[in-house]
Amino acid sequence: WTDKMKKTTTILLTAGILASLVFSGCGPGGQQIKIGVAGPLTGEQGKAGQDLLHGVQLAVSECNARGGVLGKRVVIIAGDDRADEKEANAIAQRLCDQGVAGVVGHYNSHCSIAGSRIYNQRMIPQITPSSTNPKFTQQGFDNVFRTCGRDDQQGRIAADYAFNVMKVKKVAIFSDGTTYGLGLAEEFKKSILLNNKPKKVEVTIVAEAQIPVITEGKAPDYGPLLDPLISYQPDLIYFGGSYPEGAMLIRQVKERRLAAAFMSGDAIANSELIKRGGVATEGIYFTFGPAVEDMPQAGRFYDSFKARYGELGPYSVYAYDAATVLLKSIELAGTTSGDSLVKVIHSAKFAGAMGELEFDGNGDIKAAPYVLWTVKGGEFGPVKAEVQVQ
Protein backbone atom coordinates (compact mmCIF):
# COMPACT_ATOMS: atom_id res chain seq x y z
CA TRP A 1 0.00 0.00 0.00
CA THR A 2 1.06 3.57 -0.50
CA ASP A 3 1.08 5.98 2.44
CA LYS A 4 -1.95 7.65 0.90
CA MET A 5 -3.86 4.37 0.93
CA LYS A 6 -2.91 3.76 4.55
CA LYS A 7 -4.44 7.10 5.48
CA THR A 8 -7.69 6.61 3.58
CA THR A 9 -8.52 2.93 3.87
CA THR A 10 -8.28 0.44 6.71
CA ILE A 11 -7.88 -3.20 5.61
CA LEU A 12 -8.08 -6.11 8.00
CA LEU A 13 -6.83 -9.20 6.19
CA THR A 14 -5.97 -12.72 7.19
CA ALA A 15 -5.12 -15.80 5.15
CA GLY A 16 -7.60 -18.65 5.02
CA ILE A 17 -10.14 -17.47 7.60
CA LEU A 18 -10.69 -14.32 9.57
CA ALA A 19 -9.32 -14.40 13.07
CA SER A 20 -11.16 -12.73 15.91
CA LEU A 21 -10.84 -9.00 15.37
CA VAL A 22 -11.50 -6.34 17.97
CA PHE A 23 -12.67 -2.89 16.88
CA SER A 24 -13.05 0.20 19.00
CA GLY A 25 -16.45 1.68 18.42
CA CYS A 26 -17.53 -0.92 15.87
CA GLY A 27 -20.74 -2.01 17.48
CA PRO A 28 -24.13 -0.38 17.02
CA GLY A 29 -23.72 3.37 17.24
CA GLY A 30 -19.96 3.12 16.68
CA GLN A 31 -18.01 5.32 14.31
CA GLN A 32 -17.23 2.67 11.68
CA ILE A 33 -19.20 0.81 9.05
CA LYS A 34 -17.67 -2.52 8.06
CA ILE A 35 -17.69 -3.86 4.51
CA GLY A 36 -16.59 -7.42 3.76
CA VAL A 37 -14.49 -8.46 0.76
CA ALA A 38 -14.01 -12.14 -0.03
CA GLY A 39 -11.95 -13.87 -2.71
CA PRO A 40 -8.77 -15.84 -3.41
CA LEU A 41 -6.21 -13.35 -2.12
CA THR A 42 -3.38 -15.89 -2.20
CA GLY A 43 -2.56 -19.03 -4.18
CA GLU A 44 -2.92 -19.73 -7.90
CA GLN A 45 -5.75 -17.22 -8.28
CA GLY A 46 -4.26 -14.66 -5.90
CA LYS A 47 -3.78 -12.07 -8.65
CA ALA A 48 -7.52 -12.15 -9.43
CA GLY A 49 -8.43 -11.77 -5.77
CA GLN A 50 -6.07 -8.84 -5.28
CA ASP A 51 -7.53 -7.15 -8.38
CA LEU A 52 -10.96 -7.47 -6.79
CA LEU A 53 -9.73 -6.12 -3.45
CA HIS A 54 -8.08 -3.13 -5.09
CA GLY A 55 -11.34 -2.14 -6.74
CA VAL A 56 -13.10 -2.12 -3.37
CA GLN A 57 -10.19 -0.30 -1.72
CA LEU A 58 -10.46 2.51 -4.23
CA ALA A 59 -14.22 2.90 -3.79
CA VAL A 60 -13.93 2.91 0.01
CA SER A 61 -11.00 5.33 0.10
CA GLU A 62 -12.90 7.76 -2.12
CA CYS A 63 -15.96 7.39 0.10
CA ASN A 64 -13.95 8.10 3.25
CA ALA A 65 -12.34 11.12 1.59
CA ARG A 66 -15.86 12.50 1.15
CA GLY A 67 -16.61 11.98 4.84
CA GLY A 68 -17.70 8.35 4.87
CA VAL A 69 -21.29 7.15 5.00
CA LEU A 70 -23.87 8.38 7.51
CA GLY A 71 -21.05 10.33 9.14
CA LYS A 72 -19.05 7.15 9.78
CA ARG A 73 -15.76 5.88 8.42
CA VAL A 74 -15.90 2.76 6.24
CA VAL A 75 -13.59 -0.13 7.14
CA ILE A 76 -12.82 -3.13 4.92
CA ILE A 77 -12.59 -6.62 6.39
CA ALA A 78 -11.03 -8.91 3.78
CA GLY A 79 -11.08 -12.70 3.82
CA ASP A 80 -8.99 -15.08 1.72
CA ASP A 81 -11.16 -18.01 0.62
CA ARG A 82 -8.29 -19.49 -1.45
CA ALA A 83 -10.85 -20.44 -4.14
CA ASP A 84 -12.03 -23.21 -1.83
CA GLU A 85 -15.68 -23.86 -1.01
CA LYS A 86 -15.04 -24.81 2.63
CA GLU A 87 -12.89 -21.73 3.16
CA ALA A 88 -15.63 -19.63 1.57
CA ASN A 89 -18.10 -20.97 4.13
CA ALA A 90 -15.71 -20.14 6.96
CA ILE A 91 -15.07 -16.65 5.60
CA ALA A 92 -18.79 -15.98 5.17
CA GLN A 93 -19.52 -17.01 8.75
CA ARG A 94 -16.70 -14.89 10.17
CA LEU A 95 -17.71 -11.84 8.12
CA CYS A 96 -21.26 -12.18 9.41
CA ASP A 97 -20.02 -12.58 12.98
CA GLN A 98 -17.91 -9.43 12.61
CA GLY A 99 -21.02 -7.44 11.72
CA VAL A 100 -20.32 -6.38 8.14
CA ALA A 101 -23.06 -4.34 6.48
CA GLY A 102 -22.53 -6.14 3.18
CA VAL A 103 -20.05 -8.22 1.22
CA VAL A 104 -18.34 -7.76 -2.14
CA GLY A 105 -17.52 -11.29 -3.28
CA HIS A 106 -16.75 -13.96 -3.77
CA TYR A 107 -14.66 -14.28 -6.94
CA ASN A 108 -15.42 -17.88 -7.93
CA SER A 109 -18.97 -19.07 -8.56
CA HIS A 110 -18.69 -22.11 -6.28
CA CYS A 111 -17.45 -19.89 -3.45
CA SER A 112 -20.15 -17.26 -4.02
CA ILE A 113 -22.86 -19.92 -4.01
CA ALA A 114 -21.45 -21.56 -0.87
CA GLY A 115 -21.19 -18.26 1.01
CA SER A 116 -24.59 -17.01 -0.18
CA ARG A 117 -26.48 -19.47 2.02
CA ILE A 118 -24.82 -18.02 5.11
CA TYR A 119 -25.24 -14.40 4.06
CA ASN A 120 -28.90 -15.09 3.30
CA GLN A 121 -29.52 -16.48 6.79
CA ARG A 122 -28.33 -13.13 8.18
CA MET A 123 -29.89 -11.09 5.32
CA ILE A 124 -26.56 -9.46 4.50
CA PRO A 125 -26.33 -8.06 0.95
CA GLN A 126 -23.83 -10.00 -1.16
CA ILE A 127 -22.68 -8.49 -4.45
CA THR A 128 -20.29 -10.55 -6.56
CA PRO A 129 -18.28 -8.74 -9.21
CA SER A 130 -17.22 -11.89 -11.05
CA SER A 131 -19.31 -15.02 -10.35
CA THR A 132 -21.07 -15.70 -13.64
CA ASN A 133 -22.76 -19.05 -13.03
CA PRO A 134 -26.55 -18.52 -13.43
CA LYS A 135 -27.30 -20.66 -10.35
CA PHE A 136 -25.98 -17.94 -8.04
CA THR A 137 -29.05 -15.75 -8.57
CA GLN A 138 -31.48 -18.63 -9.08
CA GLN A 139 -31.57 -19.82 -5.47
CA GLY A 140 -34.53 -17.69 -4.44
CA PHE A 141 -32.39 -15.41 -2.25
CA ASP A 142 -33.36 -11.73 -2.17
CA ASN A 143 -29.96 -10.56 -0.91
CA VAL A 144 -27.66 -11.73 -3.74
CA PHE A 145 -26.59 -9.53 -6.65
CA ARG A 146 -23.92 -9.39 -9.34
CA THR A 147 -22.39 -6.56 -11.34
CA CYS A 148 -21.14 -8.95 -14.05
CA GLY A 149 -23.06 -10.96 -16.64
CA ARG A 150 -23.91 -14.67 -16.68
CA ASP A 151 -22.46 -17.74 -18.37
CA ASP A 152 -25.56 -18.36 -20.45
CA GLN A 153 -24.99 -14.91 -21.95
CA GLN A 154 -21.28 -15.20 -22.69
CA GLY A 155 -21.64 -18.83 -23.76
CA ARG A 156 -24.14 -17.76 -26.40
CA ILE A 157 -21.92 -14.91 -27.64
CA ALA A 158 -18.93 -17.26 -27.95
CA ALA A 159 -20.94 -19.96 -29.72
CA ASP A 160 -22.48 -17.49 -32.17
CA TYR A 161 -19.03 -16.19 -33.11
CA ALA A 162 -17.57 -19.67 -33.44
CA PHE A 163 -20.47 -20.82 -35.62
CA ASN A 164 -21.19 -17.77 -37.76
CA VAL A 165 -17.75 -16.16 -38.11
CA MET A 166 -15.22 -18.94 -37.56
CA LYS A 167 -17.44 -21.52 -39.31
CA VAL A 168 -16.26 -24.33 -37.01
CA LYS A 169 -17.44 -27.87 -37.69
CA LYS A 170 -15.56 -29.91 -35.08
CA VAL A 171 -15.21 -28.77 -31.48
CA ALA A 172 -13.42 -30.17 -28.41
CA ILE A 173 -14.73 -28.95 -25.05
CA PHE A 174 -12.78 -29.00 -21.78
CA SER A 175 -13.54 -27.67 -18.31
CA ASP A 176 -11.68 -27.47 -15.02
CA GLY A 177 -14.50 -29.25 -13.18
CA THR A 178 -15.51 -26.25 -11.05
CA THR A 179 -19.05 -24.91 -10.83
CA TYR A 180 -17.99 -22.06 -13.09
CA GLY A 181 -15.99 -24.14 -15.55
CA LEU A 182 -18.55 -26.91 -15.96
CA GLY A 183 -21.38 -24.42 -16.26
CA LEU A 184 -19.67 -22.26 -18.87
CA ALA A 185 -18.62 -25.25 -20.97
CA GLU A 186 -22.18 -26.59 -20.86
CA GLU A 187 -23.66 -23.22 -21.89
CA PHE A 188 -21.27 -23.01 -24.83
CA LYS A 189 -22.05 -26.57 -25.88
CA LYS A 190 -25.79 -25.99 -25.61
CA SER A 191 -25.61 -22.80 -27.66
CA ILE A 192 -23.40 -24.09 -30.45
CA LEU A 193 -25.50 -27.23 -30.89
CA LEU A 194 -28.65 -25.10 -31.06
CA ASN A 195 -27.08 -23.31 -34.04
CA ASN A 196 -27.19 -26.62 -35.93
CA LYS A 197 -30.97 -26.75 -36.18
CA PRO A 198 -31.97 -23.52 -37.95
CA LYS A 199 -28.86 -23.41 -40.16
CA LYS A 200 -28.86 -27.16 -40.93
CA VAL A 201 -25.09 -27.20 -40.54
CA GLU A 202 -23.61 -30.01 -38.53
CA VAL A 203 -21.28 -29.14 -35.64
CA THR A 204 -19.76 -32.16 -33.96
CA ILE A 205 -18.37 -32.34 -30.43
CA VAL A 206 -15.37 -34.60 -31.03
CA ALA A 207 -14.13 -34.63 -27.42
CA GLU A 208 -15.37 -33.52 -24.02
CA ALA A 209 -13.49 -33.87 -20.73
CA GLN A 210 -12.48 -32.32 -17.41
CA ILE A 211 -8.84 -31.38 -16.93
CA PRO A 212 -7.04 -31.65 -13.57
CA VAL A 213 -6.42 -28.35 -11.79
CA ILE A 214 -3.08 -27.10 -10.53
CA THR A 215 -2.45 -28.13 -6.92
CA GLU A 216 0.42 -26.84 -4.78
CA GLY A 217 2.06 -25.36 -7.85
CA LYS A 218 2.37 -28.76 -9.56
CA ALA A 219 1.76 -28.68 -13.31
CA PRO A 220 -0.63 -31.39 -14.53
CA ASP A 221 0.07 -33.26 -17.75
CA TYR A 222 -2.85 -32.82 -20.13
CA GLY A 223 -1.28 -35.13 -22.71
CA PRO A 224 -3.69 -38.07 -22.23
CA LEU A 225 -6.60 -35.71 -22.98
CA LEU A 226 -4.93 -33.77 -25.80
CA ASP A 227 -3.15 -36.53 -27.71
CA PRO A 228 -6.39 -37.99 -29.15
CA LEU A 229 -7.14 -34.58 -30.68
CA ILE A 230 -4.27 -35.10 -33.11
CA SER A 231 -6.44 -37.61 -34.96
CA TYR A 232 -9.75 -35.79 -34.35
CA GLN A 233 -8.37 -32.49 -35.72
CA PRO A 234 -10.94 -30.13 -34.14
CA ASP A 235 -11.40 -26.64 -35.56
CA LEU A 236 -11.86 -25.21 -32.07
CA ILE A 237 -10.94 -26.09 -28.49
CA TYR A 238 -13.28 -24.46 -25.96
CA PHE A 239 -12.25 -24.26 -22.30
CA GLY A 240 -14.39 -23.49 -19.28
CA GLY A 241 -12.01 -22.56 -16.49
CA SER A 242 -9.59 -20.03 -15.04
CA TYR A 243 -6.29 -18.56 -16.20
CA PRO A 244 -3.79 -20.81 -14.34
CA GLU A 245 -5.08 -23.98 -16.00
CA GLY A 246 -5.95 -22.08 -19.17
CA ALA A 247 -2.36 -20.96 -19.69
CA MET A 248 -1.07 -24.48 -19.16
CA LEU A 249 -3.67 -25.99 -21.48
CA ILE A 250 -2.87 -23.49 -24.23
CA ARG A 251 0.86 -24.23 -23.97
CA GLN A 252 0.33 -27.96 -24.19
CA VAL A 253 -2.04 -27.55 -27.15
CA LYS A 254 0.61 -25.55 -29.01
CA GLU A 255 3.30 -28.08 -28.13
CA ARG A 256 1.29 -30.67 -30.06
CA ARG A 257 1.02 -28.30 -33.00
CA LEU A 258 -2.73 -28.65 -33.14
CA ALA A 259 -4.21 -26.24 -35.67
CA ALA A 260 -7.37 -25.70 -33.61
CA ALA A 261 -8.31 -22.21 -32.49
CA PHE A 262 -8.66 -21.74 -28.71
CA MET A 263 -11.60 -20.01 -27.02
CA SER A 264 -12.61 -19.53 -23.39
CA GLY A 265 -14.55 -17.28 -21.03
CA ASP A 266 -13.99 -14.35 -18.71
CA ALA A 267 -11.94 -16.18 -16.06
CA ILE A 268 -8.87 -16.42 -18.28
CA ALA A 269 -8.90 -12.63 -18.73
CA ASN A 270 -5.90 -11.91 -16.54
CA SER A 271 -2.42 -10.68 -17.39
CA GLU A 272 -1.07 -13.80 -15.68
CA LEU A 273 -2.45 -15.83 -18.61
CA ILE A 274 -0.02 -14.16 -21.01
CA LYS A 275 2.86 -14.27 -18.51
CA ARG A 276 2.38 -18.00 -17.95
CA GLY A 277 1.34 -19.00 -21.45
CA GLY A 278 3.81 -16.83 -23.34
CA VAL A 279 3.65 -16.71 -27.14
CA ALA A 280 1.32 -19.72 -27.14
CA THR A 281 -1.52 -17.39 -26.06
CA GLU A 282 -1.22 -15.33 -29.24
CA GLY A 283 -4.49 -15.43 -31.18
CA ILE A 284 -6.66 -17.09 -28.52
CA TYR A 285 -10.23 -15.85 -27.98
CA PHE A 286 -12.32 -15.22 -24.88
CA THR A 287 -15.48 -13.41 -23.87
CA PHE A 288 -15.46 -10.48 -21.46
CA GLY A 289 -17.09 -7.09 -20.94
CA PRO A 290 -16.12 -3.97 -22.89
CA ALA A 291 -12.73 -2.38 -22.24
CA VAL A 292 -12.79 0.05 -19.32
CA GLU A 293 -11.07 2.61 -21.55
CA ASP A 294 -14.13 2.50 -23.81
CA MET A 295 -16.63 3.16 -21.02
CA PRO A 296 -17.55 6.87 -21.16
CA GLN A 297 -18.19 7.14 -17.40
CA ALA A 298 -15.08 5.22 -16.33
CA GLY A 299 -12.42 7.85 -17.03
CA ARG A 300 -12.00 9.02 -13.43
CA PHE A 301 -11.96 5.45 -12.12
CA TYR A 302 -9.42 4.39 -14.74
CA ASP A 303 -7.04 7.27 -13.97
CA SER A 304 -7.35 6.85 -10.19
CA PHE A 305 -6.86 3.10 -10.30
CA LYS A 306 -3.82 3.27 -12.58
CA ALA A 307 -2.26 5.95 -10.36
CA ARG A 308 -2.67 3.84 -7.21
CA TYR A 309 -2.09 0.29 -8.40
CA GLY A 310 -0.60 0.42 -11.88
CA GLU A 311 -2.08 -2.45 -13.85
CA LEU A 312 -5.86 -2.51 -14.10
CA GLY A 313 -7.29 -5.92 -13.17
CA PRO A 314 -10.09 -7.26 -15.39
CA TYR A 315 -12.63 -7.38 -12.58
CA SER A 316 -11.42 -4.34 -10.64
CA VAL A 317 -14.07 -2.03 -12.10
CA TYR A 318 -16.79 -4.60 -11.38
CA ALA A 319 -15.63 -4.76 -7.75
CA TYR A 320 -15.43 -0.97 -7.60
CA ASP A 321 -19.02 -0.70 -8.79
CA ALA A 322 -20.18 -3.46 -6.42
CA ALA A 323 -18.72 -1.49 -3.51
CA THR A 324 -20.23 1.72 -4.90
CA VAL A 325 -23.69 0.11 -4.95
CA LEU A 326 -23.27 -1.15 -1.40
CA LEU A 327 -22.07 2.19 -0.03
CA LYS A 328 -24.73 4.19 -1.85
CA SER A 329 -27.47 1.83 -0.64
CA ILE A 330 -26.41 2.49 2.97
CA GLU A 331 -26.63 6.21 2.31
CA LEU A 332 -30.07 5.93 0.68
CA ALA A 333 -31.43 3.60 3.36
CA GLY A 334 -30.03 5.69 6.20
CA THR A 335 -29.13 2.49 8.01
CA THR A 336 -26.99 -0.66 7.74
CA SER A 337 -30.00 -2.92 8.30
CA GLY A 338 -29.75 -5.76 5.79
CA ASP A 339 -33.46 -5.83 5.00
CA SER A 340 -33.43 -2.11 4.22
CA LEU A 341 -30.30 -2.34 2.08
CA VAL A 342 -31.68 -5.24 0.05
CA LYS A 343 -34.86 -3.29 -0.70
CA VAL A 344 -32.88 -0.25 -1.81
CA ILE A 345 -30.56 -2.26 -4.07
CA HIS A 346 -33.53 -3.92 -5.76
CA SER A 347 -35.37 -0.65 -6.33
CA ALA A 348 -32.75 2.04 -6.99
CA LYS A 349 -30.55 2.92 -9.95
CA PHE A 350 -26.88 3.50 -9.21
CA ALA A 351 -24.27 5.60 -11.01
CA GLY A 352 -21.16 3.46 -11.38
CA ALA A 353 -17.92 3.62 -13.31
CA MET A 354 -19.48 1.29 -15.90
CA GLY A 355 -22.55 3.51 -16.24
CA GLU A 356 -26.01 3.18 -14.74
CA LEU A 357 -26.46 0.02 -12.70
CA GLU A 358 -29.86 -1.54 -12.12
CA PHE A 359 -30.76 -5.03 -10.93
CA ASP A 360 -33.66 -7.29 -11.86
CA GLY A 361 -35.76 -9.31 -9.44
CA ASN A 362 -33.17 -12.08 -9.24
CA GLY A 363 -30.29 -9.72 -8.53
CA ASP A 364 -28.77 -9.89 -12.02
CA ILE A 365 -27.51 -6.70 -13.62
CA LYS A 366 -30.00 -5.58 -16.26
CA ALA A 367 -27.45 -4.58 -18.90
CA ALA A 368 -24.65 -7.12 -19.41
CA PRO A 369 -22.71 -6.47 -22.62
CA TYR A 370 -20.09 -9.00 -23.72
CA VAL A 371 -17.28 -8.55 -26.22
CA LEU A 372 -15.10 -11.14 -27.89
CA TRP A 373 -11.44 -10.52 -27.07
CA THR A 374 -8.16 -11.87 -28.40
CA VAL A 375 -4.44 -11.74 -27.65
CA LYS A 376 -2.45 -9.82 -30.22
CA GLY A 377 1.16 -8.76 -29.82
CA GLY A 378 1.13 -10.03 -26.24
CA GLU A 379 -1.80 -7.82 -25.24
CA PHE A 380 -5.55 -8.23 -24.79
CA GLY A 381 -7.83 -6.43 -27.21
CA PRO A 382 -11.44 -6.71 -28.44
CA VAL A 383 -11.96 -8.30 -31.86
CA LYS A 384 -15.63 -7.61 -32.23
CA ALA A 385 -18.03 -4.75 -31.66
CA GLU A 386 -19.93 -4.84 -28.38
CA VAL A 387 -22.84 -7.27 -28.35
CA GLN A 388 -25.72 -6.50 -26.01
CA VAL A 389 -27.44 -9.60 -24.63
CA GLN A 390 -30.84 -9.51 -23.01
Regions found by a protein language model. Give the residues of each.
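Extracellular/periplasmic periplasmic-binding protein-like sensory domains
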Residues: 232, 250-320, 334, 376-389
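Extracellular/periplasmic Venus flytrap/periplasmic-binding protein
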Residues: 90, 134-135, 142-255, 290-300
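Short, low-complexity disordered leader/linker segments with a strong preference
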Residues: 1-34, 65, 97, 388-390
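Loop/turn elements at helix/coil->beta-strand transitions in domains of secreted/extracellular proteins
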Residues: 33, 71-74, 98-102, 121-126, ...
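Beta-alpha junction/loop-to-helix N-cap segments that form part of ligand/metal-binding clefts
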Residues: 27-32, 47-52, 62, 66-141, ...
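Segments of small-molecule ligand-sensing domains
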Residues: 305-316, 327-382
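Extracytoplasmic "Venus flytrap"
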Residues: 36-57, 79-86, 107-110, 177-182, ...
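Periplasmic-binding protein-like
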Residues: 95-107, 127-129, 170-175, 232-242, ...
